[in-house]
Design a protein with these regions (language model features):
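Extracellular/cell-surface secretome signature
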Residues: 43-44
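Alpha-helix termination/capping residues and helix-transition junctions
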Residues: 11, 83, 184-186
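Primarily recognizes the serine-hydrolase "nucleophile elbow" in alpha/beta-hydrolase
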Residues: 154-190
Length: 190
């Protein structure tokens, strides 16, 4: 248990230090949804185009769907714990969408926690994945905050009422990691 907590602290500290550099102002108010960044040429240009990569999970990760609180199901990439567990790590994508790089990160985090935590990389763009900065900006700008909250709440319901949830994300996902901790209320552990 100490190893899991230590790993989460290291990962969260690292991600928070990065997220402070590019996306710190987006969630300064309850209305911030990061779309303001999509018109900032420096912000857009600071994102390197992801290298081509096709992920094949070695730990059993697979795409799933789950019910949300609106009419459209949510999607995610799930790596189930080796043992029955109510411990969950929600992984939030950066502005590119739930691409194969995020799936790889989910697998890495799963392995770092000894395979004893359910890891769910949540698709915040309903299946859209950007390969250009322009598409990434468009997807982030058009992301509807209510829909995103419905996706998070659907993921929480999928995890179950007894789930203890930690979260991590990068840039866009870092903001949603924070928001999901707020939405998770007593289920949030980090």
């Amino acid at each position: 248990m100490k190893k899991i907590i230590l790993t989460l602290l290291v990962v969260l500290t690292t991600s928070l230090s990065y997220s402070q550099s590019c996306c710190q102002l987006a969630f300064a108010s309850n209305e911030g949804n990061m779309s303001e960044f999509t018109t900032d040429e420096n912000f857009v240009a600071s994102h390197q185009i992801p290298l081509e990569y096709n992920h094949n999970s070695l730990v059993g990760g697979e795409m799933i769907t789950f019910k949300t609180t609106d009419v459209t199901d949510g999607n995610g990439y799930l790596v189930k714990s080796k043992i029955k567990s109510n411990k969950w790590l929600f992984v939030y994508q950066e502005w590119w969408g739930l691409n194969d790089h995020i799936k790889k990160q989910a697998d890495i985090l799963y392995n770092e926690m000894g395979g004893n935590v359910n890891v769910l990389a949540i698709d915040m763009y309903d299946g859209k994945v950007a390969t250009t900065r322009e598409d990434a900006a468009k997807y982030m700008q058009s992301a509807d905050e209510k829909r995103l909250e419905n996706i998070v709440n659907g993921a929480l319901a999928y995890a179950g009422k007894k789930a203890k949830v930690a979260s991590i994300g990068w840039c866009f996902g870092g903001g949603w990691s924070l928001k999901s901790a707020i939405l998770s209320k007593k289920q949030a552990i980090g």
